[in-house]
Amino acid sequence: MIGIDIVSISRIDEMINKFGEKALKRFLNESEILLTKSSQNAAGFWAAKEAFSKALGTGIGSECSFLDIEISKDQKGKPFFTTKTLNKFNIKQADLSISHDGGFAIAAVILLK
């Protein structure tokens, strides 16, 4: 299952400027907030979570919320979905790629059940 999402970094930046950390807490877990040092990073996580939900076939909603999906980073900074997230949705393997360019963040996700 494949999911892709793109988001304007300025959209996330505007949310953060308007609502502060409260905005981040609507779509990021505490551990993720510690990893996001910029609007660019936050936008990448937003796109990754949207892409995950699309690959799952549910979209963001009652079956799969932003806070149900948790992202971490390895020692080299590569993002990945936590084991907790994979177990919650019965996913055997997940691949995640996030990129930023031209004012946008994009994420691609492949899930195997």
Swiss-Prot record:
Cofactor(s) this protein cannot do without: Mg(2+)
The UniProt record lists the keyword NAD: no
GO MF: holo-[acyl-carrier-protein] synthase activity; magnesium ion binding
InterPro entries linked to this entry: 4-PPantetheinyl_Trfase_dom, 4-PPantetheinyl_Trfase_dom_sf, ACPS, Ppantetheine-prot_Trfase_dom
Annotated Pfam families: ACPS (PF01648)
Primary site of residence: cytoplasm
Keyword Lipid metabolism: yes
Keyword list, A-Z: Cytoplasm, Fatty acid biosynthesis, Fatty acid metabolism, Lipid biosynthesis, Lipid metabolism, Magnesium, Metal-binding, Transferase
GO BP, sorted A to Z: fatty acid biosynthetic process
Binding site for Mg(2+): D5, E50
GO cellular component, one term: cytoplasm
EC number: 2.7.8.7
Catalytic reaction annotation: apo-[ACP] + CoA = holo-[ACP] + adenosine 3',5'-bisphosphate + H(+)
Location of this chain's protein in the cell: Cytoplasm
Function: Transfers the 4'-phosphopantetheine moiety from coenzyme A to a Ser of acyl-carrier-protein.
Family: Belongs to the P-Pant transferase superfamily. AcpS family.
Protein name according to UniProt: Holo-[acyl-carrier-protein] synthase
Organism this protein belongs to: Nautilia profundicola (strain ATCC BAA-1463 / DSM 18972 / AmH)
